[in-house]
């Protein structure tokens, strides 16, 4: 496991989904627009959008005027769904090893990690993309790559 709970692609996916949620209904956003406005490397966008399309969270349209839009309202997309689509079972990984904890006695940190993991899963399950849009509007938060703590950027609006 990396030094972050969520992978960099997962962080990019969440940022892109928030961007799409901020668009008017029916408006498709191009890959270039999303990458430019959310500071996402273009090489990552297709990789993170494919599983989101497969999981019916995103819709894509090819051609002129095409791009991506949310397939369901943002208040129906839980962060846990995005994380599971992108990172799979990574949250089951031990904080000390690159694999899932199999025996709680093997890892002295297991009981503490299990409690933290449960709280984090509850947060991901109870938080929607719409919630992040509201948070970003109220504090103008940016969601950094690599899953670091969100940064507060003073709003210029």
Name the predicted role of every residue range.
Residues 41, 71:
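Helix-turn-helix DNA-binding motif, specifically the short coil turn and the N-cap/start of the second
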Residues 8, 73-98, 113-118:
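Conserved segment of winged-helix/HTH DNA-binding domains
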Residues 1-6:
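Short, Lys/Arg-enriched N-terminal segment that forms or immediately precedes the first helix
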Residues 57-70:
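Beta-hairpin "wing" of winged helix-turn-helix
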Residues 98-157:
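C-terminal regulatory/oligomerization modules of transcriptional regulators
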Residues 44:
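Residues in the helix-turn-helix
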Residues 48-53:
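Basic amphipathic alpha-helical segments that dock to polyanions
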Residues 8, 12-40:
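N-terminal helix-turn-helix DNA-binding core of bacterial DNA-binding proteins
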């Amino acid at each position: 496991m990396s030094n972050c709970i969520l992978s960099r692609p997962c962080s990019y996916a969440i940022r892109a989904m928030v961007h799409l949620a901020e668009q008017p209904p029916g408006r498709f956003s191009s890959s270039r627009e999303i990458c430019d406005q959310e500071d996402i490397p273009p090489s990552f966008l297709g990789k993170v959008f494919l599983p989101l399309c497969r999981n019916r969270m995103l819709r894509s349209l090819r051609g002129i005027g095409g791009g991506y839009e949310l397939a369901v309202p943002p208040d129906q997309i839980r962060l846990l769904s995005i994380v599971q689509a992108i990172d799979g079972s990574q949250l089951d990984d031990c904080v000390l090893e690159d694999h899932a904890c199999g025996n709680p006695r093997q890892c002295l940190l297991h009981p503490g990690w299990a409690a933290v993991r449960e709280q984090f899963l509850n947060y991901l399950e109870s938080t929607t993309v719409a919630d992040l849009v509201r948070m970003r509007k109220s504090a103008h938060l940016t969601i950094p790559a690599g899953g670091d703590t969100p940064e507060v950027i003073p709003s210029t609006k």
